[in-house]
Design a protein with these regions (language model features):
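Membrane-proximal helix-turn-helix segments that form the acceptor-binding/catalytic region
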Residues: 81, 110-129
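Nucleotide-sugar-dependent
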Residues: 187, 233-271, 280-289
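Boundary detector for helix-to-coil junctions that initiate low-complexity/charged tails
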Residues: 353-435
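Conserved catalytic-core segment of nucleotide-activated headgroup transferases in glycan assembly
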Residues: 18-39, 154-246
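Donor nucleotide-sugar binding/catalytic pocket of nucleotide-sugar-dependent glycosyltransferases
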Residues: 126-163
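A charged, aromatic-enriched C-terminal amphipathic alpha-helix characteristic of glycosyltransferases
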Residues: 318-349, 353, 360-370
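N-terminal pre-catalytic "stem/leader" segment of glycosyltransferase-like enzymes
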Residues: 1-70
């Protein structure tokens, strides 16, 4: 932190109390920890080892809740009460439109966020300010809370050092086409599966497909030209170090067209560009607003366009270098966190101002939503407890079965048992049983 950044701090914003269940993941780093590091703000962590400490909320000049934190509903209510009584602005940060998860999204199929949706909606109504990653997300949220600020995701240049694009590979080298992302992106990868299969045949022996994080789609696993790097970590600091050590010639960023994906940020563009690698991106809002087709990236919206874009980059190393160079220049000019961290400070200062003028959510509706949320959270907890009890019982029974099997094995392998069997056979031979 330099003195100029220190001078940026508003007099009333020095300590931020942050509630998240994972302070080391990408979400927490991009949305608060990284900006706070650049600004010299002290982050007071409200959760340790899964235990929530609501009282720490009063230590902050502003309180920030990470998207689905309100699922800890009793803790959320205590924090909200402290914020109101102590006149501390309460900020809810939302980076994904969890209310609109597609039917085939893994998180929806596994109900990972089902129990948190209503508590999060209540927090969205009650927050003094909501910070979001994109304008599309703002347009959705603003119907429920007028105090919304867009804080885009930026590349933290304390962790990332953008590379100079190179003219690669050598004529006899294979071209590496890569994808990086979590397991929830399987439906997106399925979108371009036919294209990958076509390219693999068209350029047989010349291509390698690399997947960092998520498993290659079904139909690609086990192929010699497909490589899975599953060791990608959830710790964002370690991930940044690890991913910058990787190499590729072309990156892909497919997204299926739905409201959930249209509200996503362009973070993949930033991280791909940091490696000095050109990319092909879905022609959707996360990328439409930051990528100029043919200049700092390529955009595709159907199989034919995906194939044409990838083929053009495969066959033209000069185009790869040109696009990568432009993307890296755009990254350095417009997307470094060091140049935009002050936006977080401005947003938190705005939260202090809107707190005094914000119209409270309708009391009757808030009370109803709070009661429903309590019941949903209690039901979710009850269900999980029941599942744990059944799981523990299954483990106990399996242990008992193993013990009985060991006992039986001991009996049947003993000398006494073998002699008993011998005598039985002898008796049956002397006096066969009557039919």
């Amino acid at each position: 932190m330099n003195p100029e950044q220190n001078d940026q701090r508003a007099p009333n914003i020095r300590n931020v109390c942050f509630y998240s269940f994972n302070f080391q993941d990408a979400l927490s780093h991009l949305r608060l920890v990284g900006p706070a590091n650049h600004l010299g703000l002290k982050v007071i962590y409200g959760v340790e080892n899964g235990q929530v400490f609501p009282d720490r909320a009063q230590m902050g000049d502003v309180i920030v809740l990470q998207r689905d934190f309100p699922r800890a509903f009793e803790a959320y209510q205590a924090i909200q009460k402290i914020a109101k009584s102590k006149q501390i602005p309460l900020v809810l940060d939302i980076d994904d439109l969890l209310f609109e998860l597609p039917d085939d999204h893994p998180d929806r199929l596994q109900h990972n966020f089902s129990a948190t949706l209503l508590p999060t909606f209540l927090a969205m109504l009650e927050a003094d300010l909501i910070t979001v990653t994109t304008h599309a997300l703002r347009d959705y949220v603003i119907d429920f809370n007028k105090n919304v600020v867009v804080l885009a995701n930026y590349l933290d240049d304390l962790l990332w050092q953008p590379k100079t694009p190179l003219l690669t590979p050598q004529p006899d080298s294979k071209i590496k086409i890569g994808y990086m992302g979590g397991h929830t992106h399987q439906p997106d990868l399925t979108l371009i599966l036919p294209v990958i299969a076509q390219l693999s045949q068209q350029f047989a022996g010349r291509l390698e497909f690399h997947f960092w994080g998520t498993q290659p789609p079904e139909g690609l696993s086990g192929r010699q030209d497909v490589h899975w790097h599953k060791e990608v970590t959830w710790n964002y600091h370690d991930f940044a170090i690890n991913f910058q050590a990787q190499s590729a010639d072309i990156f892909m960023a497919p997204l299926t067209d739905n409201l959930f994906n249209r509200c996503k940020s362009s973070i993949k563009y930033l991280e791909y560009s940091a490696l000095g690698v050109p990319g092909v991106y879905s022609r959707l809002e996360p990328y439409n607003s930051v990528i100029k087709h043919g200049v700092n990236g390529l955009l595709a919206s159907n199989d034919e366009e995906w194939r044409d874009c990838l083929v053009s980059l495969i066959e033209n190393p000069e185009l790869r270098q040109s696009i990568a160079t432009n993307a890296t220049a755009d990254l350095s000019s417009n997307w470094l966190l060091s140049e935009h961290a002050s936006l977080w400070l401005s947003a938190y200062q705005e939260a202090r101002e809107t707190m005094t003028s914000k119209i409270d959510a309708d009391l009757k509706m808030s009370t109803m939503l709070r009661n429903i949320s309590q019941q949903i959270v209690a039901m979710d907890r009850f269900t999980k407890d029941q599942l744990k009890q059944k799981s523990d019982r299954i483990i106990e029974l399996e242990h008992q079965v193993a013990q009985h099997e060991a006992t039986i094995e001991g009996i049947t392998s003993s000398r006494t048992w073998k002699l008993a069997l011998l005598f039985r056979r002898m008796r049956e031979a002397i006096s066969p049983p009557k039919r």
